[in-house]
């Protein structure tokens, strides 16, 4: 908002939000009670299930998004379902953020699948042209080693891919503590 980064996440744990490699993302809270009653799970087992055994791993048997890419290339229906769930959640959050902020200036894809899967980026943004998001397919399909804009020149929302440099980020944080 007003050219400032915003994070709207205010949950207790990292479970809220998107489906992740091993985390479930948003779920109906009653699922917890149902599983404990019907499945006999303990609190610790539920914690392990939601944090380490859910998400993409529960859907395809692996938390590695490259395995999801392989399943998609093989036209596997289980892979397609996982892909659809992931894309649906991303689009739902984009819409929610746009509503809360009154629009978006920039969407940034980074790390893992955001950085390395042009197909996933395209799927997440496909059909959002009415919201001012237009992807340049040629730019999206290039391998990026520097921050790259992948939206069209006429897109109202700038879409970027920013390669992750975790070592640099860690070094910068460490320097702050060293001062």
Residue ranges and their predicted role:
Residues 21-25, 36, 58, 83, ...:
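Hydrophobic alpha-helical scaffolding
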Residues 2-8:
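Short, small-residue-biased leader/transition segments that mark boundaries at the very start
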């Amino acid at each position: 908002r007003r050219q400032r980064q915003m994070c709207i996440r205010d949950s207790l744990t990292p479970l809220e939000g998107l489906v992740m490699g091993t985390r479930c993302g948003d779920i109906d809270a009653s699922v917890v009670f149902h599983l404990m009653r019907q499945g006999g799970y303990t609190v610790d087992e539920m914690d392990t299930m939601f944090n380490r055994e859910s998400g993409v791993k529960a859907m395809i048997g692996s938390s590695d998004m490259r395995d999801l890419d392989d399943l998609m290339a093989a036209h596997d229906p289980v892979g397609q379902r996982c892909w659809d769930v992931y894309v649906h959640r991303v689009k739902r959050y984009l819409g929610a953020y746009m509503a809360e902020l009154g629009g978006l200036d920039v969407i940034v894809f980074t790390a893992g699948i955001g950085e390395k899967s042009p197909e996933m980026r395209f799927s997440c943004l496909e059909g959002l042209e009415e919201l001012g998001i237009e992807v340049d397919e040629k730019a999206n399909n290039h391998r990026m080693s520097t921050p790259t804009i992948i939206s069209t020149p006429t897109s109202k929302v700038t879409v970027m891919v920013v390669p992750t440099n975790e070592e640099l980020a860690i070094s910068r944080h460490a320097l702050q503590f060293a001062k």
